[in-house]
């Protein structure tokens, strides 16, 4: 089976291209003009049945808009949905489990949202026939004998009510008008009186979740519910979903592995080639599913979908060799909010995590270190070079390559810079306009731009936001390696505890009252900081015996009771 994908957003025919793909195609030269041709909108198109997979058009396309992929012929029987000619397609389909929580795991652009749309009835399986899609009866017949058939039968008879929390926020108006009940007490009272336009990302996420939970539905779907939420609220939402929807069918898409593991009963892995095609795996228990994803190999299907196994490592110990920077105790007042910090020092190779809920001064802290905010005693003059990636990233008009050149005009000649942009996947974005980047692509550009700068201290505010699991792990590895090799240091604000655990040798734990006061502890070993945080929220964690990833214990389980009794809330 052959797949030809042309990304119309990147194909610049006919304005800036004379169809070089057609000019170089051997089949076109032989007289089969319809192998590569222009569609009515002027964009290039490929007839897959005539293509011989020579790959010449892929190599010669100046805009990197073409992909030719060969799959086993038997995959044609599993084709479930295709958007249009030469577009993304998905094989197999996500299968909801009655009165259980199903988690979907996979890279961005691999078909998770497409499958959610299929399950919610927003789009319907067409089995590749996008011009003449099948009827409901034909769809149900096609899935005869499969676990998904009864669900789709009920869905198309309108006997299944679905509540969907979308990935993108769709809020407009007063919060109290959007959330009539808030049955589970998710939203703070002060937020209820505000307009949705004034909400932070975390507040908007909580509103969307509350709206979804207020529905009386049969199936609840949550697309990336943990985005923008702090650790405390991630735990709160996971617990609410588990308890409030214990007798409902639930589907969750999430990139935070700790939360996904804690929240779900079953996992389906989506793999393939991002933006080209996605394949849905069989159903697995959550622990097995996540460990299988980490291993990159599906034993039941005998498929290796990644050529390496993800290694979950504990952050290496710090050397405390040479002090790079020290800061005194300081205070920052912004309106009614006040931040009071302890003094601290960073050593060569240090990566220090910042842990705490939203609204208690974490971003204020690193902005003060970066010299963006004045303290009560004036701006801090630390006498060092600082590179800073803010939480909110501005998407300026212009090419990605120009944005990188603004950081360092000579970056194409520097091996270190090229390695950074290659490992983060920014190379394939060079000809894109920054304004057209997705949230994840913009995040990777911002991280690359920060790491390319010559600095003594690197400050990262939520670097994993909008990144999929593999991009998060690549970012962890990259930051860790650069700080270790260059003997520089970094401070990382992060809500993904696996990120903190894997990268940060030390951490600072923030406490206080959101929007009013923030207090910092002294810098301490990360294991101690996580232990203290977990104690404050009455949650225990352990390491998985196979993958070594952190896992949350179920409340009142044997391990949970034993760890709480011993005071070891994070069992190493």
Question: Can you describe what each PLM-predicted range is?
Answer:
Residues 1-14, 20-23, 27, 33-45, ...:
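Pre-NBD coupling/linker segments of ABC/ABC-like ATPases
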Residues 97-103, 107, 113-182, 256-267, ...:
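ABC ATPase nucleotide-binding domain signature region
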Residues 181-194, 414-429:
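Conserved ABC ATPase "signature" region
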Residues 195-199, 203, 433-437, 441:
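Conserved ABC ATPase signature
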Residues 209, 237, 447, 475:
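Hydrophobic anchor residue at the start of the ABC signature
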Residues 224-225, 462-463, 470:
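Walker B catalytic motif
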Residues 231-232, 469-470:
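Helix N-cap at the start of a conserved alpha-helix in ABC-type nucleotide-binding domains
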């Amino acid at each position: 089976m052959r797949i030809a994908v042309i990304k119309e957003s990147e194909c610049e025919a006919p304005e800036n291209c004379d169809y070089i793909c057609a000019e170089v195609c051997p089949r076109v030269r032989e007289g089969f003009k319809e192998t590569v041709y222009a569609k009515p909108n002027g964009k290039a198109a490929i007839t897959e049945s005539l293509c011989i997979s020579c790959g010449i058009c892929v190599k010669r396309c100046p805009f990197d808009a073409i992909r030719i992929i060969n799959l086993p012929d038997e995959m044609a029987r599993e084709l479930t949905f295709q958007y249009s000619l030469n577009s993304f397609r998905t094989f197999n389909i996500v299968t909801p489990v009655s009165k259980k929580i199903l988690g979907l795991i996979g890279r961005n652009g691999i078909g998770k949202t497409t499958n959610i749309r299929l399950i919610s009835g927003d789009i319907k399986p067409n089995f590749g026939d996008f011009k003449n899609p099948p009827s409901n009866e034909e769809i149900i017949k096609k899935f005869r004998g499969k676990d998904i058939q009864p669900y789709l039968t009920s869905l198309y008879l309108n006997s299944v009510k679905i509540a969907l929390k979308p990935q993108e926020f769709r809020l407009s108006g007063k919060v109290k008008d959007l959330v009539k009940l808030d049955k589970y007490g998710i939203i703070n009272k002060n937020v209820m009186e505000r307009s949705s336009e004034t909400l932070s990302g975390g507040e908007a996420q909580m509103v969307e979740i509350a709206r979804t939970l207020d529905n009386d539905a049969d199936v609840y779907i949550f697309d990336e519910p943990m985005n923008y939420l702090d650790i405390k609220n991630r735990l709160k939402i996971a617990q609410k979903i588990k308890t409030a929807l214990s007798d409902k069918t639930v589907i969750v898409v999430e990139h935070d592995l700790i939360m996904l593991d804690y929240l779900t009963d079953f996992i389906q892995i989506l793999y393939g080639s991002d933006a080209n095609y996605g394949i849905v795996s069989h159903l697995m228990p959550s622990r097995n599913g996540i460990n299988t994803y980490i291993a990159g190999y599906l034993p039941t299907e005998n498929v290796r979908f990644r050529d390496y196994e993800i290694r979950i490592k504990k952050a290496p110990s710090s050397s405390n060799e040479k002090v790079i920077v020290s800061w005194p105790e300081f205070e920052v007042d912004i309106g009614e909010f006040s931040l009071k910090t302890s003094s601290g020092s960073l050593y060569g190779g240090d990566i220090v995590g910042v842990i705490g809920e939203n609204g208690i001064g974490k971003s204020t802290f690193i902005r003060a270190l970066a010299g963006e905010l004045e303290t009560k005693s004036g701006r801090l003059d630390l006498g060092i070079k600082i590179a800073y990636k803010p939480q909110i990233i501005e998407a300026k008009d212009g090419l990605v390559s120009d944005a990188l050149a603004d950081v360092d005009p000579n970056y194409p000649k520097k091996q270190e810079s090229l390695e950074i942009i290659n490992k983060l996947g920014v190379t394939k974005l060079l000809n894109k306009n920054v304004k057209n980047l997705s949230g994840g692509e913009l995040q990777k550009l911002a991280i690359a731009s920060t790491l390319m700068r010559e600095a003594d201290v690197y400050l990262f505010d939520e670097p994993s936001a909008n990144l999929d699991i593999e991009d998060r792990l690549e970012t962890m590895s990259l930051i860790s390696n650069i700080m270790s090799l260059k003997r520089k240091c970094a401070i990382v604000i992060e809500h993904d505890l696996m990120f903190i655990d894997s990268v940060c040798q030390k951490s600072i734990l923030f406490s206080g009252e959101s929007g009013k006061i923030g207090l910092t502890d002294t810098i301490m070993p990360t294991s101690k900081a996580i232990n203290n945080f977990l104690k404050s929220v009455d949650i225990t964690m352990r390491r998985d015996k196979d993958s070594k990833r952190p896992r949350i214990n179920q409340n009142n389980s044997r391990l949970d009771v034993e760890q709480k009794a011993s005071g070891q809330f994070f069992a190493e």
